[in-house]
Amino acid sequence: MSLLARLEQSVHENGGLIVSCQPVPGSPMDKPEIVAAMAQAAASAGAVAVRIEGIENLRTVRPHLSVPIIGIIKRDLTGSPVRITPYLQDVDALAQAGADIIAFDASFRSRPVDIDSLLTRIRLHGLLAMADCSTVNEGISCHQKGIEFIGTTLSGYTGPITPVEPDLAMVTQLSHAGCRVIAEGRYNTPALAANAIEHGAWAVTVGSAITRIEHICQWFSHAVKR
């Protein structure tokens, strides 16, 4: 059975929760062994896949995990707003470190490497691809290229103001277009995650609400202030 078929079966049997194990950069939790522990805990609690940033984190997580790993590398570039897996060598490094699925910024913004070249390199390694998109048009374009997973990852993050609520309308439109949608971005409660599934998402990625202790503590701290 192919990886995609196994993942489809897992989503059908266990639900579509993907956990993004990305600690706050530079925080006490930002250590590969802690990321690996997070990933194992997420998988033991029902996550069908995890999303891991960085080669050292991925190498540390891989031996301890049987569920698929979505691998990314984040970079801050001077000549492009694209941050997620912008280079071909990033794809190579993620593949060598054990990623099953490679996600990359698929927005229609200026970029060092075009989407087709990134996809070709992912296919060269025999891996699945996830397009992190900011608009419906981007998602449909990537779906037409044969990219397996279309994420709403960048919706609300390419403009000056980030909305509070997730983009459920984007989920619905991409689902109606036939995409295998991974809802991602501001799904910080179980109710919002359930709403994404109700709106047609194939799976939902949750990050901060599960793995970023600083964010969660701030939510509670602000709530109890007098």
From Swiss-Prot:
This is Putative N-acetylmannosamine-6-phosphate 2-epimerase. GO terms for biological process: carbohydrate metabolic process; N-acetylmannosamine catabolic process; N-acetylneuraminate catabolic process. PANTHER family: N-ACETYLMANNOSAMINE-6-PHOSPHATE 2-EPIMERASE-RELATED. Converts N-acetylmannosamine-6-phosphate (ManNAc-6-P) to N-acetylglucosamine-6-phosphate (GlcNAc-6-P). Disulfide bonds: none annotated. Pathway: Amino-sugar metabolism; N-acetylneuraminate degradation; D-fructose 6-phosphate from N-acetylneuraminate: step 3/5. Pfam families: NanE (PF04131). GO terms for cellular component: cytosol. Its EC number is 5.1.3.9. Keywords: Carbohydrate metabolism, Isomerase. It catalyses: an N-acyl-D-glucosamine 6-phosphate = an N-acyl-D-mannosamine 6-phosphate. The keyword Magnesium does not apply. GO terms for molecular function: N-acylglucosamine-6-phosphate 2-epimerase activity. The keyword RNA-binding does not apply. Belongs to the NanE family.
